[in-house]
Amino acid sequence: MKVRASVKPRCEYCKVIKRKGVIRVICSRTPKHKQRQG
């Protein structure tokens, strides 16, 4: 999980979602692409 100021989908499998007011990127294919805005 990377914590970044700016989160972007890194591949076609990345999804941008909002949980409890925090923007996150989850990826079904490459778990390394997981990100959270912070």
UniProtKB/Swiss-Prot annotation:
Gene: rpmJ
GO cellular component: cytoplasm; ribonucleoprotein complex; ribosome
Annotated PANTHER family: 50S RIBOSOMAL PROTEIN L36, CHLOROPLASTIC (PTHR42888), LARGE RIBOSOMAL SUBUNIT PROTEIN BL36C (PTHR42888:SF1)
Organism ancestry: Bacteria, Bacillati, Chloroflexota, Chloroflexia, Chloroflexales
GO molecular function, one term: structural constituent of ribosome
The family this protein is said to belong to: Belongs to the bacterial ribosomal protein bL36 family.
A Gene Ontology biological process term: translation
SUPFAM superfamilies on file: Ribosomal protein L36 (SSF57840)
PROSITE patterns, A to Z: RIBOSOMAL_L36
HAMAP family in the record: Ribosomal_bL36
Lineage top rank: taxon: Bacteria
Protein name, UniProt field: Large ribosomal subunit protein bL36
Keywords of the record: Ribonucleoprotein, Ribosomal protein
Matches recorded under NCBIfam families: rpmJ_bact
Keyword Ribonucleoprotein: yes
InterPro entries documented for this protein: Ribosomal_bL36 (IPR000473), Ribosomal_bL36_sp (IPR035977)
